[in-house]
Each structure stands twice: as structure tokens, then as C-alpha cells.
């Protein structure tokens, strides 16, 4: 349920917004189609975009609702609550069978069904060979067409399999010092995604290449918050990731940062004044200066008269 719900919207901010409104850990036990629908509608009314531009599901009124998110939530309700799709999934004999189970539902489409099957396979629910099945999405098809002049009648999936199986030979042939994911080589899904990214890169770098897609709609926006990297535990690389990050990053001394921040805040507070305070201070200084000047002049005049008086006494 959680995998399906996240994948449909595929946006961390949407997930976090749901969690903040539900007030609990998102589980099937607290799923309510109407409640979730109202929460997401509220988010959209506030100006939030609840979908990402990647892995978008089909948009239609298949389940009779006017809004896209309502139909997608109805799809989740049908799959998880009514059909209990988890039962045939755990009984499936291979990854391709899971793909066909998911692809039989409306609003998903073949590519989304493949991505969803892969995500489920990353979990502890099932455990099939990741390279046992693949399909090429529209972006990967365009990327393959731009990489190969002629594929000798091979299908797009065959090209992805070939790239997956021959990656080490190609790295050596091209002199590429490819850095694997802590010893984990590229899988079929990775090569599929790479062909898709190649298509996007070529649109910008080589706009003259023949393609039915010319422009790049989405622009990368970095996330200021630090990323807590975590991979499927079955990959057995999370400990290595943490060790590598610990070697790269200096220890962060939070108490010192807090002390420094408080000291800086105090210093800024002592320096920053409002315009009215500055104006009052200037006025006070002006009055003080004027008074001191008058006092000095009066004192000087008295001294002069005293000196004259003393001089008269001498004569």
C-alpha cells in the first residue's frame, strides 16, 4: 500500500503533507479515500503541486471522479482494499508476472507498471532477479535511437539487456573509470533510466538530432536540506554508504554551532537599530553637541574676560 501510494504521486512533499495532516504513520489501517482526497485537495487549494513530473500515471475519469487525484486514490482503493492485489503478487513466480498483474489495472500503463513492480521488488515482499525482466519507457526508446544507428532488429529491451551484460567490457573499451554503487553494478532498470537521461541530455546538447521531443520541461532545483541516503537493505550496502560519508564529512559539533549562533545573534542585536532609534540618537547627539559647544563658548568668554581683568590689575 505505501509503495503504491507514494509511486502514484512520486513526490516527497506530498507524502510529508499527508503525514502531517493524518498525524500518524501512513498505513493501510488509516487509509480512507475521502479523507486522503480532501487533504490533497486542501494542498492544491493552497497552491501546492501534488504530482511530480516523473513517472506520471495516466489521467482520466475511469473511476467516475472529476479530479485526477481522486481517481488515483480510487485506483489504490480498488487494488489494495477490494482486490487485495498483494495476494497474487506474493504468489507470482517471476518479475514479469508481477508486471502483468499491475499492468492489467487502469491508469497505470506499461511503463508505470514496470517501475512499480521494480519498487515492490526492492522491498522485502518479493525478491526476484532484477535483470530477469525489463521494458523501455518512451524516454529510453528515444535515447536508444540516439545512441545506435542500427540495432540489427533487436528490440529496445534486448538493447537494455545487452548494455547490462556488457557494461564492464564497454567501460574498459572506452577507458571509463566507472564508479559502481559500492560494488553494485548497473542493473537493467538502471540502464533503462540511463537511456532516458541520455535522451534529455541530447535535447540540450544536440538539439539537431531527430526526435519527437525537443524541449526539456522540468529544470533541476537543488534541495537545501541534507539527504539521508538509504538503499534497500537487501542490497547490503547501507553500512558502506555510512562509512564513506563519515570519511568525507568532518564531525559536526552542534553545541559549538549553537553557541556561535547565539553569540552572533547577540552581536547583531547590539548593532541593529530601527530607523526611529537611530533618528532619536542623532537628535540627542545634536542637542548634546550644541549644548557642549555653547558651554565651551561661554567658558572661553569668561576666561577671556578674566584674563583681561588680570592684565588690567598688572598695569
PLM-predicted stretches and their roles:
Residues 171-292, 296-315:
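Low-complexity, acidic/Ser/Thr- and charged residue-rich accessory regions of DNA metabolism proteins
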Residues 56-106:
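Helix-hairpin-helix/helix-loop-helix acidic hairpins
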Residues 121-172:
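Phosphate-backbone recognition surface of nucleic-acid-processing proteins
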Amino acid at each position: 500500500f505505501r509503495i503504491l501510494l507514494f509511486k502514484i504521486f512520486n513526490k516527497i512533499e506530498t507524502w510529508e503533507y499527508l503525514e502531517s495532516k493524518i498525524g500518524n504513520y501512513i498505513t493501510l489501517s488509516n487509509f480512507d479515500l475521502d479523507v486522503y482526497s480532501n487533504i490533497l485537495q486542501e494542498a492544491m487549494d493552497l497552491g501546492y503541486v501534488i504530482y511530480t513530473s516523473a513517472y506520471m500515471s495516466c489521467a482520466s475519469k475511469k473511476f467516475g471522479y472529476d479530479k485526477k487525484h481522486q481517481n488515483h486514490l480510487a485506483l489504490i482503493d480498488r487494488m489494495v482494499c477490494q482486490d487485495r492485489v498483494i495476494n497474487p503478487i506474493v504468489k507470482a513466480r517471476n518479475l514479469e508476472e508481477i508486471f502483468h498483474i499491475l499492468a492489467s489495472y487502469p491508469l497505470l500503463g506499461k511503463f508505470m507498471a514496470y517501475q512499480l513492480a521494480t519498487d515492490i521488488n526492492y522491498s522485502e515482499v518479493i525478491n526476484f532477479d532484477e535483470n530477469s525482466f525489463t521494458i523501455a519507457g518512451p524516454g529510453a526508446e528515444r535515447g536508444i535511437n540516439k545512441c545506435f544507428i542500427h540495432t540489427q532488429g533487436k528490440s529496445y529491451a534486448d538493447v537494455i539487456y545487452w548494455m547490462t551484460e556488457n557494461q564492464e567490457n564497454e567501460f574498459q573499451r572506452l577507458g571509463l573509470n566507472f564508479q559502481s554503487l559500492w560494488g553494485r553494478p548497473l542493473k537493467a532498470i538502471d540502464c533503462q533510466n540511463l537511456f532516458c537521461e541520455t535522451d534529455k541530455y541530447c535535447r540540450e546538447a544536440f538539439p539537431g538530432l531527430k526526435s519527437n521531443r525537443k524541449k526539456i520541461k522540468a529544470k533541476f532545483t537543488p534541495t537545501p536540506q541534507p539527504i539521508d541516503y538509504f538503499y534497500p537493505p537487501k542490497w547490503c550496502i547501507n553500512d558502506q554508504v555510512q562509512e564513506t560519508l563519515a570519511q568525507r564529512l568532518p564531525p559536526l559539533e552542534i553545541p559549538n554551532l549553537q553557541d556561535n549562533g547565539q553569540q552572533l545573534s547577540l552581536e547583531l542585536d547590539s548593532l541593529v537599530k530601527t530607523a526611529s532609534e537611530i533618528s532619536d540618537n542623532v537628535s540627542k547627539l545634536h542637542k548634546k553637541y550644541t549644548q557642549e559647544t555653547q558651554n565651551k563658548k561661554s567658558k572661553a568668554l569668561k576666561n577671556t574676560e578674566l584674563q583681561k581683568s588680570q592684565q588690567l590689575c598688572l598695569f
